[in-house]
Amino acid sequence: MPKKYGVKEKDQVVAHILNLLLTGKLRSGDRVDRNEIAHGLGVSRVPIQEALVQLEHDGIVSTRYHRGAFIERFDVATILEHHELDGLLNGIASARAAANPTPRILGQLDAVMRSLRNSKESRAFAECVWEYRRTVNDEYAGPRLHATIRASQNLIPRVFWMTYQNSRDDVLPFYEEENAAIHRREPEAARAACIGRSELMAQTMLAELFRRRVLVPPEGACPGPFGAPIPGFARSYQPSSPVP
């Protein structure tokens, strides 16, 4: 595989292992083959070790002395937990923004919202979503919260949301609610919008993993994002803002 310039080799290895996991090529309990990764990516064992340290910290793999690295539990509950954490953690920063919104930040968020509303293509919409989150988090999340948010997003693949055709219709109402809550200075409403968005994203991601047969839906579960909730995962929030 050719080297990706501008991307750290460690990050390239992390992305590769996560892709193997999300495509079903690595499953719970599987051993991570360092030699295979080194050969496939054309990297040394140093960035592979660095990647495994990060993935162990993030709960994706566990290392066993003299035995190697193994994939941790990866199931419906794992996906739900990652998204739940993402919603809660982003909700902290968003609630802080609502508690103390400055004219500068409100202006920046409104500009991103205009781009979100005008983005009809999934990739452009996803880029605007990340810009909105960056704007909030760079201003209101400290280094520790920033790092924890990044770790929670490992199993929320950007490539999927850049190609998912319904991302705008599904996700935009939550950003409308969050932005309005920040303007109204309502921290709990801003937090709830983040949590609701993450809940919907979790069900959408699970539906795709069920379709790929990477995961098996629990008996009696409806994998669709707008059907009955997956057992153990009740959607707590519905946006009221329509998609224009």
UniProtKB/Swiss-Prot annotation:
Record SMART domains: HTH_GNTR
PROSITE patterns: HTH_GNTR
Organism superkingdom: Bacteria
DNA-binding residues (ranges): 34-53
GO molecular function ontology, one term from the record: DNA binding
InterPro entries with a match to the protein in the record: TF_FadR/GntR_C, Tscrpt_reg_HTH_GntR, WH-like_DNA-bd_sf, WH_DNA-bd_sf
Pfam family, one: GntR
Keywords, sorted A to Z: DNA-binding, Transcription, Transcription regulation
Record protein name field: Uncharacterized HTH-type transcriptional regulator Mb0044c
